Design a protein with these regions (language model features):
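Enriched for short, Lys/Arg-rich terminal
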Residues: 64, 72-97
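A short, surface-exposed loop/turn module that caps and links secondary-structure elements
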Residues: 38-63
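Arg/Lys-rich, positively charged N-terminal/basic patches that mediate binding to nucleic acids
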Residues: 1-31
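Short alpha-helical functional segments enriched in proximate histidine and acidic residues
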Residues: 15-18, 37-41
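Generic structural signal for secondary-structure transition and capping sites
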Residues: 24, 39, 43-46, 67, ...
Length: 97
């Protein structure tokens, strides 16, 4: 099962709020595409690449537009940990696991 953590939900909300300043339609589209992209993870959990800043193969990422969708594989569950802009200087301590 794919489970969105509270920090990841907050990231998605902030992305929506930021984009909506320019286009409400595009903001909805981007957020929906991010959600859709995570939908395949329950069947293909290893589709993403390991996150180099974390150094743990169970923490992986998918890329969409300018965003990194960071998730952790834990048994049969997939936890969406964060959705971060690619330009962000991401550090291991920025990801709540």
């Amino acid at each position: 099962m794919v489970i969105w953590t509270d920090p990841a939900k907050a990231d998605l909300h902030h992305i929506f709020e930021y984009i909506t300043h320019d286009s409400h339609h595009y903001a909805k589209k981007v957020v929906q595409e991010i959600a859709d992209k995570t939908g395949v993870l329950h069947e293909l959990p290893h589709i993403g690449r390991p996150v180099p800043e974390i150094g743990d193969d169970s923490v992986r990422e998918l890329s969409l537009y300018t965003y990194r969708i960071i998730y952790e594989i834990s048994g049969r569950d997939i936890y969406i940990l964060a959705v971060a802009h690619k330009r962000r200087d991401l550090k291991a301590q920025d990801i709540t696991r």
